[in-house]
Amino acid sequence: MSSTDWILLVIVIVLFAVSIFLAMAETAFVRMNRIRALALADEGSRRAEHLLRMLEHPEQTLNALLLLVLVTQLTSATLLGVILEGTAGALGVVIGIVLQIVLFFVVGEVAPKTYAVQHTEAAALRSTPLLWFLTNFAPLRLLSRGLIGVANVVLPGKGLKEGPFITEEEILTMADV
């Protein structure tokens, strides 16, 4: 492997670690309810105050979060494919695909989401600073809104004038999956 391959491998590992944290954050966020966040905020938790504000408009946080999850996973998979194709050819790509599927499913999705289900409050509060940043980071927010606008052009319709765009029950069902 060349020095470039090693650098790419480090990037893949970092992206995978970020993806794991984002999976935990996503599940914790969708499972957290306003009542519990309000109780934690009343106890003086600054993170709970931020979480409560984000729960008032969950679509803003979820749009940015899901976009970032997609970017980290696709970039990681692509870079690993490039590395393995360069070192082992077509067989390396196949190995990379299988490796990514197993790692992303078990380590990158199931484990962090299970943790978030079992420790919802702790995971939600732990991930709040990152979610708050993502929700308020203008370039990511604008990109997310722009891509949603493109989707609305591709799939036109009246749209919804008022939320909730997704019910709390639907979010909890998605988190359980």
Task: Name the predicted role of every residue range.
Residues 1-177:
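Membrane-embedded alpha-helical segments of inner-membrane proteins
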